[in-house]
Amino acid sequence: MDEHEGDRVTESHGTGPDAFEAVLNQLDRVVMGKREVARLLLAAMVARGHVLVVDVPGVAKTRMTRAFAASLALSFQRIQGTPDLLPGDVVGVSVYDPRTADFKYRPGPVLSHLVLVDEINRATPRTQAALLECMEERQVTVDGETHRVAEPFMVLATENPVEMEGTYPLPEAQLDRFLLSTTVGYPSAAEELDMMRRLGTEDPLETLRPVASAADVDTWRREAARVRVDPVVEQYMVALVRATREQPGIRLGASPRATLALIRSVRAWAYLNGRAYVLPDDVKHMAVPVLGHRLLMAADAEVLGDSGADAVRRVLEVVAAPTETL
């Protein structure tokens, strides 16, 4: 890769690795030991995608999302998924104004920059569908009128894998709309001790200051879209996605939408790492979070505890990565 030594992202105010490091350092102050998750959130934002977090309660998903929004000076709203949550509670409603004798649109929380949908699978399919339009079309339609969401826009939805009673599992079509899926996980003993000492008396979230802006995010997105992908790396990504459709134990493989999600994600990941070109290692790093949740496992594989992430790891072992100089 010697020919790429000078092929780095050009840094300016609010761009480049230093800007990303500043955002990650902010998140480290609020949530200890979760830098990899924070990097995935940042990659999803740069790639114009949404994130699904499947994890137990109490592992700082809300804190991380709030800190992420505060660090980027973005508006933030949290929606709690419940069976009685209506589409209007998400996208907004038209309210009659007696002063003008007309209906006025009252925006819902989904028109914020960063939206946390907690326990999305507790919302009814009808409400999930309303959210789906926002995620895919980046707009909402209320009483025949269309309203664009704020940009940059990202939805971070959570699911609790333990309590599944009274839930409405997300259909495959909606899972496919999430660019990435990840878990936060419990902290290590050392991290939990550090958290107790640092957060037991004061909350750094209350004093967090922005280190970037919505304009910076827009710049990141435009620059990441120009990151080069060599044809052999493109072929490698297509081979990985196609292999998920042929592996035993997988009832439904990744769709062509997954191929597009993968190339957007690896471009963003390379950009976050200060490169204007993609390496096969970028593809390997992003394959599980991008593809794992899109696979529908066969019943016998599920009984054995086999997951989509496990299947993607097997695919990575089977499909050879390019080794020639890019």
Kindly give the residue locations of the regions a language model identified.
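Conserved AAA+/SF3 P-loop NTPase catalytic/coupling segment centered on the Walker-B
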Residues: 111-136, 150, 165-174, 186-194
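Conserved AAA+ ATPase core "coupling" helix
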Residues: 87, 167-223, 231-239
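AAA+/P-loop NTPase substrate/partner-engagement loops
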Residues: 71-99
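Conserved alpha-helical scaffold flanking the Walker A/P-loop in AAA+ ATPase domains
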Residues: 39-43, 96-116, 145
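C-terminal engagement/docking regions of AAA+ P-loop ATPases
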Residues: 8-11, 246-326
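Walker A/P-loop
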Residues: 45-82
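Pre-Walker A (pre-P-loop) alpha-helix and adjacent loop at the N terminus of AAA/AAA+ ATPase modules
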Residues: 17-56
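AAA+/SF3 P-loop NTPase mechanochemical coupling elements
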Residues: 104-113, 142-159, 170-180, 257
